[in-house]
Amino acid sequence: MLYLLKPLMMALMLVISNSVLAQLKAFPEAEGFGAMASGGRGGDVHIVTNLNASGVGSLQWAVSQPGARIVVFEVSGLIAGDLHIPHGDLTIAGQTAPGAGITLLGHMYTTYNADTGNIVIRHMRIRPGDPDNDWPANQHDAIQFSTANHIMLDHIDASHGADETIDLWGGAAHITIQYSHLSFPIYDTSNGWDHNKGVINHRPCLDSGNCQPGDRTGGYISILNNVFTHSRNRTPALSVGPAEVINNITYNGREGFVHHNISAGDFNIVGNQYIAGPSISLSPFWFDPENSSTPIPTAYWLQNNLVEDPGEYMGTVQNPWNDTDFSNAYTFACCGIQANQFNQSVAFDFGVHSGYVAPVIHSESNLEARLLPTIGAWPHDIIARTSIQELENRNGSWRNFRPADLMIGLTPTTPPIDTDRDGMPNDWELQQGLNPNDGNDHNTVMPSGYSAIEDYINGLASSLSEDLIFYDGFESQ
């Protein structure tokens, strides 16, 4: 009987393993509507071996490989070129780049009007050049995932968009942006570049009022624990719910959370910090749905949003309609928005939506101390460090900030030895009871439930973020 039971037991274990993997978050700390993206889980590992813009061993080569794939790095530094992601089921583990991290000096984008989905990207810096004929200013986003879905962006540093920093315009849905740093969108009026904005999501069919069942939905967006600096507005601009904006910091912007497209859905806006800066006067919220008729199908839950605007408003606002000091200081709604849309007694329960992982909500009073040491891609480069310093000092301005040397304070190091080229160092494999000469054991299911390669890259990301509390990637100053 044993020879009959053994294959049955193995088949059962495989089914259980696949079931467990299907229920796992992108990584243990993943939250929000994009938390269940699996990326390249279960697929091949591709190693980036050079900093070329294309060709074998490049990042572009790695993400272009067929099937599910996890991309790791044995180099670190600057990649001069755009990155096109042709299809989903992809994990990019920027945290594996040894020493200096990875900066993409170009745009990261998926094909417009394609349903590219299931992508996990961590610890990458995206810093495109100035607009040109290929990327004119009205299309010049650092990250353009306009029609993508099921995306997790974690510890991303993005800057130098001339349209938005991150574009989710065309109905993109089921997306989390968390612990990321969006700074220095391009502002240069001498060239007509004055659209320095943050993140946008919309469902274009709402504009015609003729949405069909097969249209992209938009919404299902989580903006969690991020820092925005020097963006005029759209920090973020979300017109479609369900969506949530929780525990973010916005500095030196005009408008924080905004609608300015035809809107529909429910929104939780909780525990954010809006800090006035020197470039423009602050308006923490702007609800402008541009709907042609009422009632407008939107509703809002606002709680514990901290405003630092000396001379105008200093303190925590709940429902802005019920706060006389706030409503005296700011105009925040127009075009049919009514006070009764803000009358929720509790936050919207997004747990009814499949794949949603409720975020931990932290106090709005200590966001700077908690976020500034750990946000963005590790280690912080000179752009990130400057942005953080200007926020801390409450100075700086909108501009096209381009340091001559983006490698200041960043030191590439030698990658660990990986004999079997499965993305996991020999020493780590031995510690985990794996075989450093077996190139196929990266998909071994570990006690955590994750595959071995995921355990490795997840642990590395956690340790890098913790290290940032004590070291910001720069030499002592």
What residue ranges belong to the model's regions?
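Acidic Gly/Asp/Thr-rich repetitive segments characteristic of extracellular carbohydrate-active
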Residues: 27-71, 441
